[in-house]
Regions:
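Active-/binding-site microenvironments in catalytic and ligand-binding cores
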Residues: 1-258
Length: 258
């Protein structure tokens, strides 16, 4: 059966406005000419002129966080425990079966920035697209932030998934979710306002912290979700295997059978 692949990852670039200033990625590019000098140093007697076109290798040196670019967060990122007291798993311990499964897209692009999605809103959207959640479905949330990646207000855009909305998914067997926003939760300034008004610390990172009850992973900084149908595709999002890490980068892809 013919298949179509849709890239749902964002591009990692030096200085791309994808994170707070202290977290912006930095990439140094070593061109072929510099690579020729390095290659000559590795092989005594070699000169760059002896190499085809005087070129050596091209290499990049990168200074980034595991939370730059499109990445999969492990339960360890949110807390030291999951599943009501078990040790939270790190990214190298995430079951691979979680990372390749049928995908579902929830369209919340209409919701205002800072809105905290409820379980009732998830139910309404699932009813609209005619889908009943199945165990291990990968649920992707398309927000208003997706269209703003690389803009100076990206980290402030989009709705967030609240605790009850997250648990609604997890209680039905979902173990990987994703968003095209900077965070699975609402942007920090909106949460800060709610905390200031209530003094309720449980509102801070409430979607992330749902993993303390039922462990799960989520993808952040996805892209191109508007190109996906609501159902009928498979998501591949295997993370880079970093020992004991809280997250790993992924080239997330949606696979459609046609």
């Amino acid at each position: 059966m013919p298949r179509r692949l849709i890239d749902i990852s964002t591009t990692l670039r030096t200085g791309v406005l994808s994170d707070p200033p202290q977290m912006l990625p930095e990439i140094d590019y070593i061109a072929h000419q510099q690579g020729a000098l390095e290659m000559a140093a590795a092989f005594p007697g070699l000169t760059p002129e002896q190499l085809p076109n005087g070129e050596g290798w091209a290499v990049e040196r990168v200074r980034i966080s595991t939370h730059n670019g499109t990445h999969l967060d492990a339960p360890w990122h949110y807390a030291s425990t999951m599943n009501n007291g078990q040790r939270a798993i790190t990214i190298d311990e995430v079951p691979l079966e979680w990372c390749f499964a049928p995908g579902i897209k929830l369209d919340f692009t209409r919701l205002p920035d800072g809105h905290v999605v409820t379980a009732a809103e998830v139910q309404t959207e699932l009813a609209r697209i005619g889908h009943t959640l199945q165990p291990f479905d990968i649920v992707l949330v398309n927000t208003a932030a997706g269209a703003c990646y690389g803009q100076d207000d990206y980290v402030l855009r989009g709705c967030g998934m609240g605790r009850e909305a997250t648990l609604y998914l997890l209680e039905r067997g979902v173990r990987v979710t994703g968003t095209d926003a900077w965070s699975w939760d609402a942007p920090f300034p909106y949460t800060a306002q709610r905390y200031a008004a209530t003094g309720d610390a449980s509102l801070i990172w409430e979607g992330h912290k749902a993993s303390r009850t039922i462990g799960y992973c989520h993808l952040e900084k996805l892209g191109n979700l508007e190109a996906l149908p609501a159902t009928g595709f498979t998501v591949s999002c295997f993370p880079v295997k970093i020992a004991a890490a809280s997250a790993g980068w992924t080239r997330a892809v949606a696979i459609l059978d046609e």
